[in-house]
Amino acid sequence: VSLTDLSNRPQNLSRGITLVIAAAFSISLQDLVIKLYSTQLTLWQIFALRGVLMLPLLYAVAWCRGVHRNVLRLALQRWVMLRSLFLASTFLAFYAALPFLNLSTVGAANYVAPIFVTLLSAYVIVEPVGPRGWFAVLIGFLGVVMLLQPGTDAFSYWAILPLIGATFYALAHITTRVKCHDVPLSAVALSLNLVMMAAGILGSLVITAFPPTDVLTQSYPYIFGKWGSLGVAEWQILFLLACLSLAIYMLLAGAYQAAPPSNVATFEYSYLIFVVIWDYLFFALLPNALSIFGMVLIVSAGLMVLRKQR
């Protein structure tokens, strides 16, 4: 089913909202699991092995949708692979920062993506932005400054990574809109999984061939360490992550098929509520007043962009 056909589908707003909130919850749960197990599994190990476990699951979905015969060919198309490369870079930046920041900070920084989409739309595909769009960019920038608090003790250079990830996410969004809007969802998901799995394998090989210094390995084992040992518990976690990834893909696809994207995307911000709860329950962390205000500004800017697109 192409995204261009979605306007002809019956619209079910309540179903779309329910599915996207379930997707946001699943994403927050996946991020929590990765953060909790970042001391036992490396980033590259998670990418590689989760990707392997997801392959049969993705093929099963493609088979159920009747696109299994052409799914690999479609997944390997040039523009689809470029989109997947952008998204894989997003996730690499996002997950690399997870052990060093609270979930709410990482999540809020990542939600700057709609603002970057506005900027890229103006200069890359020459779409009109208008005063409201530029005002949203300004509000979002102020929100980022308040969230990250540069120049204070609260600032962490790791917080720059989610912003880099948001930039790649915006590039992926633009690529989807311009070049990949008619690609079946199963092929898009398979392409992303293949690229992320390849990134995990390549990263692991590079670390093996060119071992980092002991200081780097001991300070940042999640990024520069060797693969952790895999027992039954670790395989269960990896399988859980694979299932969560598949659930997220299915829920998001269903949400955007059920209702207008501008309505659905508004409720993606429920993710921030979930990660604040996880931060408090699992790490006894709460954002300070300035960070909360920054999150509010970022969400407001994103909603302004979405409202403009309606």
Feature names for model-found ranges:
Residues 40-89, 168-175, 192-208:
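Transmembrane alpha-helices of multi-pass small-molecule transport proteins
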Residues 35, 58, 154-215, 224, ...:
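Transmembrane alpha-helical segments that form core, pore/gating elements
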Residues 113-138, 273-292:
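C-terminal transmembrane-helix exit sites in multi-pass transporters
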Residues 37, 46, 50, 97, ...:
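Hydrophobic/aromatic residues within transmembrane alpha-helices
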Residues 15-22, 69-93, 157-163, 214-247:
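Loop-to-transmembrane-helix transition segments
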Residues 2-45, 154-178:
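Glycine-/small-residue-enriched transmembrane alpha-helix faces in small-molecule transporters
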Residues 132-149, 290-309:
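Hydrophobic transmembrane alpha-helices of multi-pass small-molecule transport proteins
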Residues 49, 106-112, 179-195, 246-280:
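Helix-helix packing/entry segments at the starts of transmembrane helices
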